[in-house]
């Protein structure tokens, strides 16, 4: 069988099939798995890229029934039962699990693709880090840039990613860069972080009390929160809001949403809003009982609406699809059991010693307790023992010293040439 994608859903499916009497080929364009929940810490210099990525082959060193193929699946030939690879050639399959994930959705806002900084894959985080640090270096060389918005950072999207980026960026500026540029020509105190959210409240999935806590905490960190408005246009040095207001800013971080991978449209099957693929209760494709779609790419309806594109859904749906494949192969159990999502709660960190967590049945945590729970959960799910140790050491050092050791500009410079 073939599994497309080495994200949370694809890895969960592949690991579930360990020991099953099937030969598995896992295909991904990268030879590493990225722990996306911590990408914002790479972008804000808290962690290094290698801390949040782990080699795929290393994950499956002991799984004898799995082979990895570094490539991209661009189409599926249903009649011949094979996937077409971007690098040329095909892979045959008896059964297929598609877990190709999602990509950034700019909703057609003019200028976002050209001038905005997404934060969805590892190179995005490195480019954004280069750019943030580069803006301060540029302002040191030319202080007048501050008057033109050179140190104004607009974050679009008030969900967990946007809130986490805004809080971490405000702390980076206030506690680290303020110290780094002491005595330089940069007036770091004039740097500004603005968080823009289209709805009236931050963190829409959370309760009103958690939303208020997030807003209050961000304000205390110096983040300017703008709710009830959206971005209408983005230029290289300006952001125009829906009401016509113009913000002079050289940086726009786009955390406003995602859409299904382009592979969804290439499958030749019905899709829903956001390009997600419609699946049956058992996650199979209608008309293609040999194929499953899981994770962010699947429109999974649990009766109360479509499930969100989060890691929990991806992992649980990936494991479920793999279990059904195993049942079919061995001829035991129900191979068409409906998928049932078990909500384990939602968390978002707002910065040092501040987070919100809502866990079933109705448990709500805020502040330091939620922050510690957030840290522990992410360490548990992070791939690789070395990565867990490295991240823990970095977090401990940052907590004790307010230092962020990954303040490095890599590659071509500050990242402007690589924007979008």
Residue ranges and their predicted role:
Residues 1-67, 74, 153, 160-206, ...:
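Beta1-alpha1 glycine-rich phosphate/pyrophosphate-binding loop at the start
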Residues 2-4, 91-103, 231, 239, ...:
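Short hydrophobic core segments
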Residues 9, 101-104, 166, 258-260:
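Short glycine-rich anion-binding loops that position phosphate/pyrophosphate groups of nucleotides
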Residues 64-75, 170-281, 285-287, 333:
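A Rossmann-like FAD-binding core segment of flavoenzymes
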Residues 66-154, 253:
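FAD-binding core/adjacent interface of flavoenzyme oxidoreductases
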Residues 114-144, 237-240, 246-317, 323:
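FAD-site-proximal beta/loop scaffold in flavoenzymes
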Residues 147-206, 210-213, 224-226, 308-338, ...:
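Rossmann-like dinucleotide-binding core of oxidoreductases
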Residues 322-420:
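C-terminal, flexible cofactor-proximal segment of oxidoreductases
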């Amino acid at each position: 069988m073939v599994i497309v994608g080495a994200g949370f859903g694809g890895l969960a499916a592949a690991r579930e099939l360990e020991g099953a009497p099937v030969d598995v080929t896992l295909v991904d364009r990268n030879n590493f798995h990225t722990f996306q929940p911590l990408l914002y810490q790479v972008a804000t210099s808290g962690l290094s890229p290698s801390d949040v990525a782990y080699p795929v082959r290393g994950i499956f060193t002991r799984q004898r029934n799995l082979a990895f193929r570094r490539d991209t699946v661009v189409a599926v030939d249903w009649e011949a039962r094979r996937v077409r690879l971007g690098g040329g050639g095909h892979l045959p399959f008896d059964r297929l699990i598609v877990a190709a994930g999602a990509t950034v959705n700019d909703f057609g806002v003019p200028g976002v693709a050209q001038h905005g900084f997404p934060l969805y894959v590892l190179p995005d985080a490195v480019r954004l880090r280069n750019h943030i640090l580069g803006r301060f270096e540029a302002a040191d060389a030319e202080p007048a840039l501050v008057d033109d918005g050179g140190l104004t950072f607009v974050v679009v999207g008030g969900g967990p990613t946007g809130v986490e980026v805004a809080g971490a960026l405000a702390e980076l500026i206030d506690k680290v860069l303020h110290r780094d540029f002491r005595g330089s020509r940069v007036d770091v105190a004039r740097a500004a972080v603005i968080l823009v959210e289209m709805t009236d409240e931050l963190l829409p999935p959370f309760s009103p009390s958690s939303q208020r806590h997030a807003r209050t905490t961000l304000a205390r960190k110096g983040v300017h929160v703008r709710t009830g408005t959206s971005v209408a246009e983005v230029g290289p040095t300006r952001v125009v809001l829906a009401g016509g207001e113009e913000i002079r800013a050289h940086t726009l971080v786009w955390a406003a949403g995602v859409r299904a991978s382009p592979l969804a449209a290439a499958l030749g099957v019905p899709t829903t809003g956001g390009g997600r693929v419609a699946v049956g209760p058992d996650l199979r494709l209608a008309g293609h009982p040999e194929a499953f779609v899981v994770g962010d790419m699947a429109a999974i309806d649990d009766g109360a609406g479509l499930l969100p594109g989060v890691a929990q859904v991806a992992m649980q749906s990936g494991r479920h699809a793999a279990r059904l494949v195993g049942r079919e192969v061995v001829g035991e159990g129900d191979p068409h059991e409906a998928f049932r999502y078990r909500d384990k709660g939602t968390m978002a960190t707002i910065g040092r010693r501040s987070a919100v967590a809502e866990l079933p049945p109705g448990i709500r945590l805020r502040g330091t307790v939620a922050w510690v729970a957030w840290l522990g959960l992410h360490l548990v799910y992070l791939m690789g023992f070395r990565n867990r140790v490295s991240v823990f050491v970095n977090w401990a050092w940052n907590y004790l010293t307010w230092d962020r050791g990954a303040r490095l500009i890599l590659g071509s410079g500050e990242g402007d040439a690589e924007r979008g």
